[in-house]
Structures are given as structure tokens and as C-alpha cells.
């Protein structure tokens, strides 16, 4: 969609789609609005509660990675039949996960919609919550992108790396392993990592950033 849609309307797009977030300048100010859309069907299928948290955190990371302070989210929740106990259970746990993450990160859900009965015959789709997030950049000149700027740039990892591969593309597509839980979410660490990265971007100490998801 983003390859076909005219994303340069009025010439205010300063970071095009395809990165962590798209960014649009606000006319007459130094401010800019960042936006991202994320989903987590595989994680939610493996563990709906954790998957719900994951998709909110993914949006949170994508906005922060361009230098935007996350402001609010909307959602589109796609599930199978609510008359099926398993599908309804997935829905309840996923919504709980979204709520817990949004509340802790102070990243409120301001709108959304639910789509049930997404199925073929009696088999429902994987639980698929989609999150649209928006964030604010106070000075668009401080916005950053994910690409390296110089040959000798130093690469830093913010946060813990625990080597989790269950439910990853590598596990599913290379190892053909479909079982196992998604990565655990530590909301305290998510918030602290995000705030740290925003401070680094605002101070001009880093030139590029990209989330690891």
C-alpha cells in the first residue's frame, strides 16, 4: 500500500514509509508527527496475552526509533468466531495484554474496532491485532533514520539480548519449528529503554536507530 499511495501529499513528508515510522512535518512549526502500524499474529497465536503486549511495545519502539515521543494508539482487532471458546479466549487475553502495556507505557488507546468471524468454514484466523501508533517530535530537525551515516559508526545495543528465537522468522522458516512461546515482555525495561533512547536522540549523541523485534 505505501509503495502505491501518494505519501508526499503537500510536500510535508520528511521520513517516507518503509522505515520504523513515517514522519510528517506540522505546517508553520518545528514539530512533526510520526506514525507506525504494527501487527503480531504469530506471537498472539503462541500466547495471546504476551502477543498483545508485544504489538503495543513494537509500536512504542518504532516511534521512539525516529525520535518521537509516543502519544496514542488505535487498534484493529481481527479474530475468529466469538462463539468459539478458543477464539473468544484469544480475544480476551490479547485485549488484556494490550491494555496492560498501554497503561504502563502511558500510551493510551483512543479508538479502534473489532472484526470477528474471520474464518474459513470452522477454522478461524490467527489472532491478529493491528496497532496504529502516533508520536510527537518537538523539533523535526532532530529526527533520525535507521540507516548508518558513516563507515566508522559505532553500534550499541540498548537493553538486554537474551537469544530468544522461538516464534521468530528464523525458527519458523529455516528450522521449521512452530512451537514455543514468544519473547517475554518486561514493561519496566521497555519504558526505561525508550526514555533512554529519546534522551540520546534529543542530545544529538546518536545518528541512527532501529528497533530489534
List where the protein language model places each region.
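Glycine/proline-enriched, intrinsically flexible loops and inter-domain linkers
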Residues: 1-213
Amino acid at each position: 500500500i505505501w509503495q502505491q499511495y501518494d505519501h508526499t501529499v503537500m510536500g510535508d513528508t520528511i521520513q517516507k514509509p518503509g522505515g520504523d515510522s513515517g514522519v510528517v512535518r506540522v505546517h508553520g512549526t518545528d514539530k512533526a508527527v510520526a506514525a507506525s502500524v504494527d501487527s503480531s499474529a504469530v506471537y498472539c497465536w503462541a500466547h495471546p496475552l504476551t502477543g498483545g503486549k508485544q504489538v503495543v511495545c513494537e509500536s512504542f519502539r518504532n516511534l521512539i526509533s525516529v525520535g518521537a515521543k509516543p502519544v496514542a494508539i488505535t487498534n484493529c482487532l481481527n479474530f475468529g468466531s466469538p462463539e468459539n471458546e478458543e477464539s473468544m479466549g484469544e480475544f480476551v487475553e490479547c485485549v488484556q495484554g494490550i491494555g496492560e502495556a498501554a497503561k504502563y507505557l502511558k500510551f493510551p488507546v483512543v479508538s479502534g474496532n473489532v472484526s470477528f468471524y474471520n474464518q474459513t468454514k470452522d477454522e478461524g484466523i490467527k489472532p491478529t491485532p493491528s496497532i496504529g501508533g502516533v508520536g510527537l517530535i518537538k523539533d523535526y530537525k532532530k529526527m533520525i533514520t535507521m540507516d548508518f551515516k558513516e563507515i566508522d559508526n559505532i553500534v550499541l545495543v540498548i537493553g538486554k539480548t537474551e537469544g530468544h528465537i522461538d516464534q521468530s522468522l528464523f525458527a519458523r522458516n529455516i528450522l521449521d519449528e512452530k512451537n514455543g512461546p514468544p519473547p517475554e515482555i518486561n514493561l519496566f525495561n521497555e519504558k526505561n529503554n525508550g526514555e533512554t533512547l529519546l534522551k540520546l536522540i534529543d542530545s544529538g549523541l546518536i545518528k541512527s536507530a532501529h528497533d530489534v523485534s
